[in-house]
Amino acid sequence: MKFITMRNKKNTMDKYMKLIIQMPCYNEAETLNIALDALPRTLEGIDCIEYLIINDGSRDDTLQAARQWGVNYIVNFKQNKGLAKGFMAGIDGCLCQGADIIVNTDADNQYCAEDIHKLIEPILRGEADIVVGARPIDKTAHFSPVKKKLQHFGSWVVRKASNTQIPDAPSGFRAYSREAAMRMNVVNDYTYTLETIVQAGREKIPMTSVPVRTNGELRPSRLFNSIWGYVKKSMITIIRAYMMYKPLKCFTFLCIPPIL
């Protein structure tokens, strides 16, 4: 992994709030400029906005597109490491560059960047340390009926496992305070979205959700290309995350069937 500083803007204020918006990327050359152009340049309560790209071993021109656009930082993997590892590498990079708030969004432009202000407002007000953007799943045209049901079911399972009320657990459109980001520790290789909610819920990190909008689909989802593969991997992720905080309960539950 290589961390590349493209441009570091200096703020002359003694105290200021820095927001870094990060985007995990894998072969996103066709959509990256669209997603980057949509990002805010200024936000109320924020003195400095910077942009970080995680190039997860892309085989296209993603890296060149990020450089030409002028992002501040690039975390560059020579080989594909997967979404979870890319997310954590981005978080580490944002923390190293002094981010007070970190927003994670997707390079396929599925999330409406105009709603980033909604994500950071609860953090700025001191009401939460993690804010998850809740998509209008039932109104999202490019979601199939099966995908909508699985999204709702998966979110319900995560709510039970995490003891939280987050309505859209798979959403990757999120904001983290510096304090929350420093406590994140993703151990699975598949996705960070479910595990981080379970972790935050069990560690009692203040977390909330806000409604956000979505854009039209620019490319098919790479995580959801196999329905049952998605379900299997998601359930394994949730169980592993839950076992980290409730090992005795999980062990007891798994031992009941053989005993009976």
Per-region residue spans from a language model:
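Hydrophobic helical membrane-anchoring modules
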Residues: 2-17, 187-260
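Short hydrophobic beta-strand elements that form part
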Residues: 20-24, 36, 53
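Short, well-formed alpha-helical segments that are part of the catalytic scaffolds
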Residues: 28-42
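Residue-level preference for short helical/loop micro-motifs built around acidic side chains
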Residues: 30-34, 60-64, 81, 85, ...
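Short beta-strand/loop segment that forms part of the nucleotide-sugar
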Residues: 47-57
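A conserved acidic beta->alpha catalytic loop
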Residues: 55-63, 109
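Acceptor/aglycone-binding surface of glycosyltransferases and processive sugar-polymer synthases
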Residues: 73, 77-96, 101-103, 113-190, ...
